[in-house]
C-alpha cells in the first residue's frame, strides 16, 4: 500500500519472537492503519533475510504480488503417487505414434517440453502433426493437484528461477516430452494446403517418443548453413511449411511487431554480469506458426461441437484509444486506414508505412497501447492482433491452466461428454486472466530491480541512448546496447522554460526553441540507481534539435568515459516510472512554468520554510513516547516521491 509512506510500528511480541536485525527484509500484517496522531501498527510474520541476499528480489516480488509458491500438502502427496513412466494400462484408446519422428525444438535452457512437431509432404499438401503433453491424463478435475494448479493458473518465470504451475515430477518428468522416453500426448493432426489453408484436422490421444531434443540455434544453423544431420530432412520440410504459413499470415493481415529481447547473464552471486540481445531467428517463428495452427484448430473444433471453453480473445482499439492514436499519427505524418473500425490489415499497413524510420519501435508501442489486452473468456470474440476469427490456447498445458481446460473440453467432445469446471466458466476466465497479469508484473518487478542493481556500478558513466517516452516531468531514455530505461527530469534539460507538448509528443524550450522529440538520440550520464524504487535517474549531456544553445556539461568536463553500444531497443513499460532526484534548490537553475510540473528553486525555498515551521511546532508538542518497538519496514512497494508530478508514466 503506497499510502503507507511513514515508518510502521511493529508489535513488540512479534519482534521478540522473530528477533529481526537491521537491514533485513520482513513480512508484516497491518493490524491498525495510521490515524492523525498514531502510526500504523503491524504484526511481524516472517523474516526473509538480508536485503542484499542473492534471490531476495524474487522473494520480495513473490510476497508483494501474493504469488502461490508452495504446493499444499495434499498436492505434494498426490504428486508422489503419479508414476514416473507410461504404464501399459495408459495406452488404452490411444494412437501409437512412437515410430513417428517427432522432435522438440526449444531454447537451450528449457527444462519442460510440452510440444513436439513433425511434418511431411503429401502431394501438393503438407501433413503437420503437433503433439502436446497430455497433462489432463494425470491431473483430474478438482483433485489436489488440480486445485493448486487452478490457484496458480500459470507458471511464473523469473531470471534463474521458475515457480511452476505443476509439481516438478509432472512438469519436468512424466508430462514433459523428454527425448527417447514414452509419453502420453494429445495430438492435432492437420493437412495444410500449398496456399497455407488448413484443409482438414483431427484431434486424438496418443502415445509418442520424442526422437530428438533440438534447440532453436541448432535448427537455425542447419537451415542457414545447410549442415547435415539425421533430422535435417524433416527440418527442411518443416521450414518449407513455415514459409507457406508465414505468407498466409501476411495475407491474413496479422499485426507483427519486431522488438529486441534481452537475456541477463549472471555471476556466481546471482547478480547481472552483462545484458545481451537475444536474436529471434526463423526457428523460433517456425515453432510459433505450428502452435498457432494447432490453437486455431482447437478453437474451431470446440465452436463446431458447441462446447463451452476458455477462448483467447483480443479486441481491437476502443473509440477513445483510436482517436488518440490517429491524432498522434497525424502529427507524425502517418495515417491509419479503416475509419471508425480499422482491421488488423489496416494496422499491418500502418506498420509498413513506418518501417525503417528511426522512431519505428516507438510507433509500435503507440499501436500496441491502442489495442485492448488479451483475456480468457467463455465466448469467442476473435483475436485482433493475430487476425483470427477464433483462437484458443491448446499448446502449453504444463504452464497454463486455460490450455488444460481446453484439453479436457476436447476430450469430452471426443467421448461424447461435457466438461464443466467447478468454478463457472466466466469466473475461471477472470481468474486466469488476472493470474497471467500478476505473473507478468512480478517478473517485471524482478527484472527492473536486477537492472537497477546492475546500474549502481555505472553511476557517473556516460551512455548513448534514444528518447523512448516523455511526460510533463521529463524524458525517458533507453540506453543503447543494454536496453535499460532511465529518466532525465525536465528541470535538468537546461536553462530555459521547458514545456511538454503532448499533441506533438515533444518537450520544447520557450526561449531557445530547443526541442526533444520521440526517437531522438541523446547522450546521458547515470546519476542515480535507486534499489528501493527500482528506478534510474539520468542527466543530459547532449542532444535535442538545437544542441549548441544548451548550456550543459560536456564529456570532457565530467571526465567520464563514454560507453557507446550498438543501437537497439527493448520495449519495457515497467521501467517508465521516474525516481526523485535529490539536488540542492540553489543549484537548480532551470526555469519552468507551473504546468510543466517542475519544482523551481523558489518553491523549494517555500517548502523548506514550511518544513522548518512544522519542525518547530512538533518540538513544542508534548508527546508521550510509544512503548512499541519501532522498526522501519523494507518492502518492494515504492513510497510516493516528494517531487510533484513524479507519478508512473502510463
Predicted regions and their residues:
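Conserved, carboxylate-rich catalytic/transport cores that coordinate ions
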Residues: 1-592, 606-607, 620-623, 627, ...
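Short terminal targeting/anchoring segments and short Lys/Arg-rich nucleic-acid-contact patches
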Residues: 574, 598-602
Amino acid at each position: 500500500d503506497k499510502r503507507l509512506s511513514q515508518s510502521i510500528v511493529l508489535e513488540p511480541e512479534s519482534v521478540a519472537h522473530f528477533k529481526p536485525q537491521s537491514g533485513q527484509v520482513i513480512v508484516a500484517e497491518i493490524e491498525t492503519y495510521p490515524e492523525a496522531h498514531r502510526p500504523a501498527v503491524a504484526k511481524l510474520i516472517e523474516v526473509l533475510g538480508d536485503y542484499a541476499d542473492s534471490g531476495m528480489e524474487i522473494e520480495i516480488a513473490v510476497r508483494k504480488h501474493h504469488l502461490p509458491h508452495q504446493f499444499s500438502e495434499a498436492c505434494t502427496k498426490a504428486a508422489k503417487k503419479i508414476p514416473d513412466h507410461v504404464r501399459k494400462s495408459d495406452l488404452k484408446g490411444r494412437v501409437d505414434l512412437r515410430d513417428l519422428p517427432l522432435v522438440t525444438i526449444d531454447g537451450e535452457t528449457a527444462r519442460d517440453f510440452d510440444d513436439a512437431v513433425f511434418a511431411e509432404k503429401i502431394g501438393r499438401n503438407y501433413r503437420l502433426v503437433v503433439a502436446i503433453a497430455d497433462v489432463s491424463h494425470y491431473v483430474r478435475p478438482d483433485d489436489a493437484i488440480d486445485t493448486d494448479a487452478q490457484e496458480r493458473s500459470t507458471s511464473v518465470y523469473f531470471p534463474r528461477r521458475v515457480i511452476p504451475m505443476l509439481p516438478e515430477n509432472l512438469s519436468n518428468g512424466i508430462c514433459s516430452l523428454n527425448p527417447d522416453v514414452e509419453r502420453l500426448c494429445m495430438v492435432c493432426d492437420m493437412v495444410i494446403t500449398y496456399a497455407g489453408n488448413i484443409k482438414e484436422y483431427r484431434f486424438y490421444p496418443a502415445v509418442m517418443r520424442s526422437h530428438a531434443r533440438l534447440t532453436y540455434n541448432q535448427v537455425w544453423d542447419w537451415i542457414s548453413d545447410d549442415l547435415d544431420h539425421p533430422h535435417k530432412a524433416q527440418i527442411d520440410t518443416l521450414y518449407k511449411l513455415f514459409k507457406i504459413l508465414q505468407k498466409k499470415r501476411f495475407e491474413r493481415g496479422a499485426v507483427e511487431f519486431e522488438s529486441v529481447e534481452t537475456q541477463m547473464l549472471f555471476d556466481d552471486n546471482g547478480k547481472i554480469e552483462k545484458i545481451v540481445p537475444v536474436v529471434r531467428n526463423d526457428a523460433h517463428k517456425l515453432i510459433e506458426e505450428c502452435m498457432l495452427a494447432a490453437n486455431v484448430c482447437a478453437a474451431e473444433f470446440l465452436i463446431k461441437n458447441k462446447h463451452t471453453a476458455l477462448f483467447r480473445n483480443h479486441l481491437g482499439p476502443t473509440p477513445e484509444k483510436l482517436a488518440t492514436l490517429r491524432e498522434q499519427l497525424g502529427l507524425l505524418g502517418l495515417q491509419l486506414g479503416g475509419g471508425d473500425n480499422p482491421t488488423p490489415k489496416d494496422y499491418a499497413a500502418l506498420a509498413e508505412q513506418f518501417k525503417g524510420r528511426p522512431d519505428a519501435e516507438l510507433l509500435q508501442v503507440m499501436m500496441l497501447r491502442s489495442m485492448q489486452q488479451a483475456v480468457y473468456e467463455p465466448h469467442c470474440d476473435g483475436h485482433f492482433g493475430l487476425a483470427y476469427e477464433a483462437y484458443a490456447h491448446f499448446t502449453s498445458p504444463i504452464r497454463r491452466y486455460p490450455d488444460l481446460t481446453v484439453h479436457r473440453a476436447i476430450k469430452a467432445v471426443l467421448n461424447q461428454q461435457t466438461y464443466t469446471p467447478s468454478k463457472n466458466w466466466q469466473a475461471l476466465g477472470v481468474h486466469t486472466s488476472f493470474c497471467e497479469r500478476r505473473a507478468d508484473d512480478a517478473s517485471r518487478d524482478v527484472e527492473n530491480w536486477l537492472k537497477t542493481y546492475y546500474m549502481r556500478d555505472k553511476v557517473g558513466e556516460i551512455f548513448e541512448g534514444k528518447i523512448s517516452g516523455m511526460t510533463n516531468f521529463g524524458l525517458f531514455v533507453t540506453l543503447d546496447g543494454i536496453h535499460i530505461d532511465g529518466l532525465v527530469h525536465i528541470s535538468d534539460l537546461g536553462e530555459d522554460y521547458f514545456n511538454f507538448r503532448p499533441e506533438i509528443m515533444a518537450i520544447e524550450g520557450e526561449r531557445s526553441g530547443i526541442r526533444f522529440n520521440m526517437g531522438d538520440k541523446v547522450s546521458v550520464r547515470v546519476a542515480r540507481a535507486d534499489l528501493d524504487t527500482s528506478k534510474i535517474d539520468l542527466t543530459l549531456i547532449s542532444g535535442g534539435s538545437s544542441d549548441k544553445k544548451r548550456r550543459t556539461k560536456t564529456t570532457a568536463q565530467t571526465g567520464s568515459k563514454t560507453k557507446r553500444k550498438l543501437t537497439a531497443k527493448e520495449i519495457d513499460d515497467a521501467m517508465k516510472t521516474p525516481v526523485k532526484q535529490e539536488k540542492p534548490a540553489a543549484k537548480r537553475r532551470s526555469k519552468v512554468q507551473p504546468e510543466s510540473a517542475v519544482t523551481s528553486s523558489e518553491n523549494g525555498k517555500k517548502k523548506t520554510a514550511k518544513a522548518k515551521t512544522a519542525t518547530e511546532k512538533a518540538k513544542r508538542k508534548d508527546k508521550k513516547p510509544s512503548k512499541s518497538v519501532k522498526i522501519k519496514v523494507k518492502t518492494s512497494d515504492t513510497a510516493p516521491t516528494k517531487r510533484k508530478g513524479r507519478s508512473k508514466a502510463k
